[in-house]
Amino acid sequence: MNYIDTIKSITPLSLDDIIKTAKQHVPAQYRQTPWNYPGLAHGTAILQDEEQLCCYLASYGEMHQGKLACAFTKFPYLNMDKNIEIIDWGCGQGLASIYFIDNLRQYNLLEKLQKVTLIEPSYAALSRAELHLRQAVGDSVYIETLNYYLPSTVESLKANAIGGIHIEEPICIHLFSNILDIPQIDLKELAYLVSSSGYRHYFVCVGPVNFGNER
């Protein structure tokens, strides 16, 4: 089976399942060094095809999982007393959302999750993220996909940048995973978008260790 068919055979899908499956579908010549696959750019490129997506997960998936584990260590799960929605900014293949959903399931809170919004400029990665989320939550959660860049300081990207969000549930979890350190992102405009509603917001931010980066 190919990657998509394998993922569709796993319900409910977890982050461990995703990483394991991706490693199984790395091209043979890159099995030992998936990070050398052309076009990954050390994990910063906008991915375009299935092999790139699998090689990214095989290269960086476990490291990403470890950083998410640290970020969610003190998450206030006991405060999740109303319906929840997730907005995954620059979601890539949806790893942060999947990790959070894994945790909601462990805390018996998954039934409170009503909506997930996935925002990502790579159509290939966004399609993967939607597939992953659907296998993780089934049809009980509304999944919205938005194929946009985050607010940008680069003129050529502004026309394709997201201009607004629609929050429906009383609790909104914002996930920023390996995205806020990118210098082209307009943090001021992003902050405006996030603060445009009066709902209860929680922010989980994960980034690479870039010494000297003051963002």
List each language-model region with its residue ranges.
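N-terminal auxiliary segments of SAM/dcSAM-dependent transferases
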Residues: 1-38
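Class I SAM-dependent methyltransferase Rossmann-like catalytic core
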Residues: 42-78
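Conserved SAM/SAH-binding beta-strand->alpha-helix loop
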Residues: 122
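A short SAM/SAH-binding and catalytic strip from SAM-dependent methyltransferases
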Residues: 169-185
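A short glycine-rich, Lys/Arg-flanked "PGG" loop and its adjoining helix->strand segment in the class I
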Residues: 187-200
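Conserved beta-strand signature within the Rossmann-like core of class I S-adenosyl-L-methionine
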Residues: 199-210
